[in-house]
Amino acid sequence: MAIFYLAVQSVRRGEGRSAVAAAAYRAGEKLDDERTGETFNYTRRRGVVASEVIGWQGDRSSLWNAAEAAENRKNSVVAREIVIALPCELDDVRRAELVKSFAHWLHSRHGVAIDYAIHSPDKDGDQRNHHAHLMVTTRKIEGGRMGAKTRELDQKQHSRKHIEAWRSEWAAICNRALALGGTDTALDHRSYLRQAEPFGAVPLEPQKHLGPSETRLNRKGRMTAKAKQNAWARAVNKGLHQTGRLFGRGLVRGMNAMIDAAGKENLRER
């Protein structure tokens, strides 16, 4: 079943990261970083289903080298990255259309360039884990060049409302596609807490996102702390659903035994 997942992170020079290196890895390409003289070759990387640059007249190399050249500070944020889960109910072509549509929407809203790469599930991981990485410039593209900074995304008090809009738009794009495909699933970008508030109900327990390495460990029976927390959340949510209504955290009591049972199951984490 499709799930909603959208996370945003920054590519910071002060952490030793490079936008060129990140782009090369995401797209599975070989790129030269003109600022450092390094070459990043990920052409042997597997699992890249599709990739494209939106809102920039040049190629991937020229985009991210221009982004790096535009920043002079040692601790500059040279790119933003949005990671999204893609509906497993759709095929590769339809998933690519969704990501491209979202990238164009971001470009129109903020005037930035977007470089996206769609990845297939890891061979040893959850086979529903289709996802995409969208690298976003921290500057607007003006006259085919790096222009003004996207200040609306730099200030925390303002960036939150924009990220909320991103989440809402991505959910809407997915839901339209799922409905056209005849799927009953509908994604909700809101947190469980916000979903429950209008009804005065107790929200479902949220689960933590697990990366590929943690997923592999859990499949081998070595549960990480986040996996244990997810098992607890699933046990709680199962109890809440079985009541037919969400009416109190008292249901949590007595569920510890269910956690052990959940840990013995083949965890299917994203």
Locate each region found by the language model.
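N-terminal nicking endonuclease/strand-transfer module with a His-rich metal-binding environment
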Residues: M1-R270
